[in-house]
């Protein structure tokens, strides 16, 4: 059961993020002691073959089909861009790929245990982005809220989240003062696509609830109309 969960999670990373994040996850998982670890990395022939093929792909410079698309998108719209991804290993991989393309980029990740950026460092990175020291900022969830990130010309979702709130927060980082562009990268028939539609449905449901609440509040302005909680259902 535990091995099955690991395989499922690893597959999602491989499909939605890329070869390097997948291999980094496997490296950490293999170092852990627990039920199913040996079975997964030494006995399961299918998984060991997948791991071997991933290493060959990495050595040949293969990462994910999103990467060349990312380059195309960044080159099509001049100005600053903010790239969101939920996975830290993806941040490092994307940053490395952008540097190889000659695109100046910075990293913004949260602090977790002994890894990540402390708040002071996060603020420094954001300020450098605002000052134009680099044109692209690759961020995890910490970039979605809290920090005062400068206006950007486009926001790119490298992955998708099944949350209407996080979708809106990500999207809200562009188009504040002028027209901005939003690009959502989706690996077809993967968790990416599933999360995208879950998030969209939740946004639609939230808008519907907001509309109902507005109508009820307008009715309540009339003292002769009494409305209970049933009106929201």
Positions of the model-derived regions?
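Long, largely alpha-helical accessory region at the distal end of helicase-like NTP-driven motors
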Residues: 1, 213-233
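Acidic, Ser/Thr-rich peripheral helices and adjacent loops at domain boundaries
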Residues: 202-211
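Conserved helicase ATPase core of P-loop NTP-dependent helicases/translocases
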Residues: 80-84, 90-141
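Conserved RecA-like helicase motor core of SF1/SF2 enzymes
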Residues: 110-112, 116-117, 134-135, 141-177, ...
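Helicase motor interdomain insertion/brace
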Residues: 1-96, 100
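Well-ordered alpha-helical segments embedded in enzymatic catalytic cores
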Residues: 65-73, 121-125, 142
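Conserved segment of the helicase C-terminal RecA-like domain
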Residues: 130, 171-203
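Alpha-helical elements of the RecA-like P-loop NTPase motor core of helicases
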Residues: 92, 96, 145, 165, ...
């Amino acid at each position: 059961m535990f091995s099955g969960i690991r395989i499922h999670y690893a597959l999602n990373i491989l499909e939605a993020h890329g070869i390097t994040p997948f291999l980094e996850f496997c490296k950490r998982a293999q170092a852990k002691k627990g039920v199913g670890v040996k079975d997964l990395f030494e006995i399961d022939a299918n998984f060991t073959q997948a791991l071997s093929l991933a290493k060959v792909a990495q050595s040949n410079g293969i990462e994910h089909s999103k990467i060349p698309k990312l380059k195309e998108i960044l080159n099509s719209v001049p100005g600053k861009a903010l790239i969101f991804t939920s996975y830290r290993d993806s941040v490092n991989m994307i940053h490395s790929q952008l540097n190889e393309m000659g695109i100046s980029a910075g990293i913004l990740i949260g602090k977790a245990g002994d890894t990540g950026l402390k708040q002071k460092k996060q603020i420094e990175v954001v300020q450098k982005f605002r000052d134009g020291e680099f044109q692209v900022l690759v961020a995890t969830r910490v970039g979605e809220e809290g920090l005062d990130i400068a206006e950007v010309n486009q926001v790119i979702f490298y992955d998708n989240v099944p949350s209407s709130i996080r979708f809106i927060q990500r999207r809200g980082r562009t188009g504040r003062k002028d027209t901005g562009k939003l690009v959502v990268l989706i690996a077809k028939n993967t968790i990416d696509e599933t999360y995208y539609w879950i998030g969209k449905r939740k946004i639609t449901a939230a808008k519907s609830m907001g509309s109902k609440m507005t109508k009820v509040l307008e009715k309540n302005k009339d003292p002769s109309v009494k409305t209970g909680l049933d009106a929201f259902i």
